[in-house]
Amino acid sequence: MKIIVGIDLGTTNSEISCLRTEGRPEVIPVEGETIMPSCVGIDHEGRLMVGRTAKNQMVANPEQTILSIKRRMGEKITLPLGDKAFSPEEISSFILGKLKSAAETYLGQKVEKAVITVPAYFDDAQRQATREAGILAGLDVVRIINEPTAAALAYEAGREEKQRILIYDLGGGTFDASLVEMENGIVEVRSSHGDTHLGGDDFDRLLSDHVALPFKKKYGIDLKSDLKAANRLWVAVEKAKRTLSDRPFATIREEFIVGDRHLDVEISREEYEEMIRPLLRKTMIAVHSCLKDAMFLPKAIDKIILVGGSTRTPLVARMLEDDMGIEPHHEINPDLIVAMGAAIQGAAMSGAKTKAILVDITPYTFGTRAIGEYQGRMTSDVYVPVIKRNSALPVGKEELFYTNYDNQQDILVEIFQGDEPLASENIFIGNFWIKGLSKAKAGNLILLNLELDVNGILKVTAKEKATGLARTVTMDTANKGTGTNLEEKRSNI
């Protein structure tokens, strides 16, 4: 039986895990470390570096080093590296490729399939980009699961008692809150909320600003305007942040950071926590939205699990305990728990006996644009939800629509993501035409079917009821991820 590995493709760090027996998953080391920096670079001789070596060269060669690429997933951009330019999917594929290679060495066999985790609040484009990165790395991505869900699998696998668990997942670049119900090995996600641009990187930025401002006032030099100085500051701040998780004070000391100027600053944990408190309040708003969607009060929660390296900041646990009245749990390393859960899901899909079954949800509503009434007036911008957020996956829903005028033969189907009453206020996902409808009077019946699979990938079918004429499109593959584009990206790599 071939192993299906579990991968946590993170903003700051990435991990890979597998389950070879019915015991606990094992985290596979990469160059001797269980945590690999999600960093890609090119050295001065043009050689590709991934992981720790790439991060180590960041200060000396910042122009040729890329960090936090996860925050750009789903964007149609390219980033220069060496004498080429790469998409976020291509950069991520280098990270996945390094993890794959390490696993093959460790296991002594080919690794061809993987379960990859994403933030619960990743949209369709970001999920599709993650899948494409896996393909470019030579992996068959058999499942994409949400990070909080993976954490629940790892933490609660095999426990029989019924529990309601809040997963608080604060990573390097993203935040998710998910409410999970578990009973008799069934892991069912009830609701999710989050922010795909809130995490430890934002804490680093606040800390960098706090340190750089006094230096600028004293010397008239903006450390953040000098690329090498800015990267030295970033590395020093990241180290200080980790220190403040365990100690009340941290010192940032960088000699000759610019010319003959030195940086020497002491920061207290109290100062740092006051800086990040407004961002953590935003996470608590998401937590309460998550509870509201599931129609639970805080007292209904049995356990809180902390996930992600940024939860090591003591203020996180204090805020949660003060607000929810429950002391959070972090018995399993918060950096590793997601990869371990993905490995459990991978083992289940490979046919191995596992003690948990996953029932995941979509955190988003998907729908279409139609003509209708809004605030007492007719408009062609009414949003009609088809799949509601927090629906269990996989899910398929069908709604009935009508042609607008006699002999209408073409219809533009537009798909949006969101919950606002007007389509234009939601996120546009994609569109397509269905042409050649029969010449009929206005009111010709059109069936619109939306299907969302377990990976959160959306398939849309529009069909004329009278004739059966239909067109089906998998959203996000019309413009990207096609075989031709993948081959172009493979050749670029």
PLM regions: where:
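Oxyanion-binding/catalytic loops of NTP- or PPi-dependent enzymes
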Residues: 1-75, 79-85, 94, 101-493
